[in-house]
A protein has these predicted regions:
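Active-site "gating" loop of Rossmann-like NAD(P)-dependent oxidoreductase/epimerase domains
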Residues: 1-6
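Active-site helix of classical SDR
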Residues: 11
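NAD(P)-dependent short-chain dehydrogenase/reductase
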Residues: 17-65, 72
Length: 167
């Protein structure tokens, strides 16, 4: 919640801080959402639309898996607290691009930023967090999600592109 961070990161941290002492509450952390539905908030869509992509490693959350996991936590009366609800494992941007190229065959090359310095000087307004979240607590509560690589693969195989916008 301390600069330099994005408004989103700061407000998220402040929100978690505010409810931390309440006791009977859940914080279900989503990280970089995606699924098979093309759209402006979908990580897989964003990667395809960027003119240049930034190489990093992150945990990701398949939106459908996230919802099912949260409902399972609630239904099973899992202990209150904070849960990292991400598909197990992590992927790099390069791995995601490889799957997009292999499955969707976009017909264009993906260009990566040369290095962090170029990316931050040219494109980023705030620092990017590259994070791999620990899902052990989720697993220990009895909620098992499919590995992130499998969720990405299935989403791309079932990809539903947005219709072109009328001119």
């Amino acid at each position: 919640r301390h600069p330099p961070c994005s408004f989103y990161s700061g407000s998220k941290a402040l929100g978690e801080e505010a409810i931390q002492g309440l006791g009977r509450s859940y914080v279900w952390r989503l990280r970089i959402p995606f699924d098979q539905h093309d759209g402006p908030r979908n990580y897989l869509s964003k990667i395809q639309r960027y003119s240049k992509v930034y190489q990093n490693a992150n945990s990701l959350s398949h939106r459908g898996d996230f919802v099912r996991a949260c409902l399972d936590l609630w239904a099973s009366r899992a202990p209150f607290g904070t849960y990292n609800v991400t598909n197990p494992g992590f992927v790099t941007t390069g791995q995601v691009v490889e799957r997009i190229e292999a499955i969707l065959k976009p017909g264009r090359p993906f260009v990566f930023w040369a290095n962090d310095e170029e990316f931050y000087r040219t494109a980023a307004k705030t620092p990017r967090s590259n994070c791999v979240l620990d899902t052990r607590k989720l697993r220990e509560a009895g909620v098992v999600l499919r590995p992130v690589e499998e969720a990405i693969e299935e989403s791309l195989k079932q990809w539903q592109a947005e219709p072109p916008k009328p001119s």
